Amino acid sequence: MSTLGHQYDNSLVSNAFGFLRLPMNFQPYDSDADWVITGVPFDMATSGRAGGRHGPAAIRQVSTNLAWEHNRFPWNFDMRERLNVVDCGDLVYAFGDAREMSEKLQAHAEKLLAAGKRMLSFGGDHFVTLPLLRAHAKHFGKMALVHFDAHTDTYANGCEFDHGTMFYTAPKEGLIDPNHSVQIGIRTEFDKDNGFTVLDACQVNDRSVDDVIAQVKQIVGDMPVYLTFDIDCLDPAFAPGTGTPVIGGLTSDRAIKLVRGLKDLNIVGMDVVEVAPAYDQSEITALAAATLALEMLYIQAAKKGE
């Protein structure tokens, strides 16, 4: 099958059909799309349970359950009538070649951004965010990061391709400004001197959504924002299908409300990562990821409609 970049794809885990039953467009660069969905079936950088390469396919598959609702509750409008979204399928790269994946993903993102598109990406493990940040920083300059996760991913002792080091590397490369960045839902050890504002899961669960959002807006300001959501930010009761689950996380309800609260930020890129469907129950993790991705698109559509 000829796919993104006119490459033959013999993968068993990618390029089946589009998110929300959207038509596939394997040549999105010259399209009239506002937002382009790209899957990145990569999990070579994971430190825990593998299987994130199946994440994009799982998110798309379960998204058929969301496609029927036109005036989505509680938005009361159809995102597809305000926002032109296309799904360009999955990145094709040589199996086992992490460097090629990283370089191809960055090049793909740079080409889309240069054509005036915005990106919503599906991982894959969280390492895929780093080449996406590199591409976005070239286009938008230094950004703020709004990061939902159980882990800060700011660890300094990892290797070149490691899903726990991206946000140690990104500030060093000048891609993001930690002083204007927020990490939400953290509940594992981290270096308190890394510059990020960390809103741990205990705080986020105990405070009101409005209070948390007000703090996020104050920290981020008017900077361009990259929004990344690692599904293990959710408690394993709501997202068991992930590589490194941690008890004590957010409910899916709270996460959705927090994402909705980000509507007024200048979000220039988004991703949802770390869905590993082999460990899922009744597709609830994939459904949570697909729903969060849809809410991300809705906040863009709501802003466009103002």
UniProtKB/Swiss-Prot annotation:
A GO CC term attached to the entry: cytosol
Enzyme class (EC, first level): hydrolase
Keyword Metal-binding set for record: yes
Pathway(s) where this gene product acts: Amine and polyamine biosynthesis; putrescine biosynthesis via agmatine pathway; putrescine from agmatine: step 1/1
Stated regulation of activity: The expression of auh activity is antagonistically regulated by cyclic AMP and agmatine. In the presence of the cAMP receptor protein, cAMP represses the expression of AUH, while agmatine induces it.
EC number assigned by the record: 3.5.3.11
One GO BP annotation of this record: spermidine biosynthetic process
Record flagged with keyword Cytoplasm: no
Binding residues annotated for Mn(2+) 1, in chain numbering: H126, D149, D153, D230
Gene Ontology MF annotations: agmatinase activity; identical protein binding; manganese ion binding
Cofactor(s) required, per the database record: Mn(2+)
Short name of one Pfam family: Arginase
Catalytic activity of the protein: agmatine + H2O = urea + putrescine
Keywords: Hydrolase, Manganese, Metal-binding, Polyamine biosynthesis, Putrescine biosynthesis, Spermidine biosynthesis
Site keyed Important for catalytic activity: positions: H163
UniProt-annotated binding residues for Mn(2+) 2: D149, H151, D230, D232
Function: Catalyzes the formation of putrescine from agmatine.
Family membership noted in the UniProt record: Belongs to the arginase family. Agmatinase subfamily.
Name assigned to this protein: Agmatinase
